[in-house]
Every structure is written in C-alpha cells, then in structure tokens.
UniProtKB/Swiss-Prot annotation:
Coiled coil: none annotated. GO terms for molecular function: structural constituent of ribosome; zinc ion binding. This is Large ribosomal subunit protein eL43z. Keywords: Metal-binding, Ribonucleoprotein, Ribosomal protein, Zinc, Zinc-finger. It comes from the Eukaryota. The keyword Coiled coil does not apply.
Amino acid sequence: MTKRTKKAGIVGKYGTRYGASLRKQIKKMEVSQHSKYFCEFCGKFAVKRKAVGIWGCKDCGKVKAGGAYTMNTASAVTVRSTIRRLREQTEA
C-alpha cells in the first residue's frame, strides 16, 4: 500500500509537494474516482471506474459512459431531471 495518513488520506503519497490547496482538490477527485457506485441495472454497489469516463459494473457486466472522476456529472443529473419533468408533464 502507498503512504497515507489519517488527515491526508489518499494524497499522503504526495508528501509536502504541490501545496495544500491543490492536494485538497486532488483528494476530492481521487476519493470519488476510486469509490464504488450504485448500478442502475442490477441494483448493487458494484460500479467502478475502468478508464477515463468509462464505468463498469463488476456484478452484471454493464458498461456506462460517465464523467472522468465521478459516474454522473452535474450537467448529466440536470438533463436527466429535466427530461423526467418534461415526460411527466406530457403524460399528465
């Protein structure tokens, strides 16, 4: 395992290099890209990052395109909610 501390976490490997504010930004990205996400197809927390923007479920094998560091980008969430709202308006 690489170097880490309780406070620095995953960016402990960088030591004192690059500055505190940059390490905080990197920590946010690295924690989100290494975490598991919920699979919409099988309903399990098994989606992991395969490459930049490619997310795959370890359980059902489905592959989904998403953001570089998180599975869902902010703009994708906005578009999805807008489409759902418009669909509900046309049905009602």
